[in-house]
Amino acid sequence: MARSGRNAPPSGISGADAPSKLHTLIDDFCEHLDLVVGRSAATIRGYRSDLYAMADTIEDIDNFSLPTLRQWLGIAVDEGKSRATLARRTASVKAFSSWAQKNGHLKADEAARLISPKITRDLPKILGEQQAGDFVENAASTNEEEFLRDSAILELLYATGMRVAELCGIDLSDIDYDRKMVRVLGKGNKERVVPFGESAHKALRNWLDVRDEMTEDPKALFVGVRGQRINARQVRRIVDRAAKVTGVDHLSPHSLRHTAATHLLDGGADLRQVQELLGHSSMQTTQIYTHVSNKRLLEAFNKAHPRA
């Protein structure tokens, strides 16, 4: 079933009652991202929002050219848009332009020469090993079933470094308890198998002992209080509660992913192995964790070595 498609509400369209040819092509492109490429609904919404904003300025596919695209981005600069926003919009337009040219809607890939602004990537928030251990052991729910569920969620997030959306999508049948492996459906519907340790294994077993008291759902591994598959917002609340108990500020579920990756590298894991475990399509995405790991190594050296 299509997750976005051409029937999504055209929130970016303003003015005309009927969509322009450019807006229609954008919808076709988003449908391509959904049905062919397999991008997530959230990613497609981002593309659609950026491209509708472009279409509202350029108005027609016949006006789609490098000068008009630069003018549109210039307006965004004048409006004070961040470098990250400009880079994202540039990437969206370049992807659309390439698709439109390949499918005969443009004679040339007009956006190919658009230059994306460089953005500095902040190093992610990382917990120390002791902090991480304390954190995952501090599920804050008072109800026994919810406490065991939350403990299993925290343990699994830290053990595997999986994304929240991936955790929410896990079915009971995806867990191999004998081998301590979990099957995960990642970005672009790419499937991978990720190992987990004894702590997560024990937490999962404890949760399964009480799971059926919260739900009749035959598939979902984790469920909310109403018995339905848990969602990302509920997972964030679970992480927030544990963070408050542990005294950790501004910790997100993604911070556990960053922490897991860094601790793997600290422990001697190969960068390519970490890339595979995290489901990164590009090594460049994984390499940010080497900077974090190297920084931690330097801090430890400066603190502990007598000749530092």
Swiss-Prot record:
Compartment annotation: Cytoplasm
InterPro entries noted in UniProt: CB, DNA_brk_join_enz, Integrase-like_cat_sf, Integrase_catalytic, Integrase_recombinase_N, Integrase_SAM-like_N, Tyrosine_recombinase_XerC/XerD, Tyrosine_recombinase_XerCD
Pfam name, any one: Phage_int_SAM_1
UniProt GO cellular component terms: cytoplasm
Keywords: Cell cycle, Cell division, Chromosome partition, Cytoplasm, DNA integration, DNA recombination, DNA-binding
Domain Core-binding (CB): residue ranges: 20-101
Domain Tyr recombinase, residue spans: 122-302
Chief place of localization: cytoplasm
Catalytic residues of the enzyme: R163, K187, H254, R257, H280, Y289 (o-(3'-phospho-dna)-tyrosine intermediate)
GO biological process, one term: cell division
Gene Ontology terms, MF aspect: DNA binding; tyrosine-based site-specific recombinase activity
Matches recorded under SUPFAM superfamilies: DNA breaking-rejoining enzymes, lambda integrase-like, N-terminal domain
Intrachain disulfide bonds: none
Domain of life per record: Bacteria
PANTHER family: PHAGE INTEGRASE-RELATED (PTHR30349), TYROSINE RECOMBINASE XERC (PTHR30349:SF77)
Function: Site-specific tyrosine recombinase, which acts by catalyzing the cutting and rejoining of the recombining DNA molecules. The XerC-XerD complex is essential to convert dimers of the bacterial chromosome into monomers to permit their segregation at cell division. It also contributes to the segregational stability of plasmids.
Recorded family membership: Belongs to the 'phage' integrase family. XerC subfamily.
Subunit comment: Forms a cyclic heterotetrameric complex composed of two molecules of XerC and two molecules of XerD.
HAMAP family, per database record: Recomb_XerC_XerD
Protein name: Tyrosine recombinase XerC
Native source organism of the sequence: Corynebacterium glutamicum (strain ATCC 13032 / DSM 20300 / JCM 1318 / BCRC 11384 / CCUG 27702 / LMG 3730 / NBRC 12168 / NCIMB 10025 / NRRL B-2784 / 534)
Organism phylogeny: Bacteria, Bacillati, Actinomycetota, Actinomycetes, Mycobacteriales
UniProt gene name: xerC
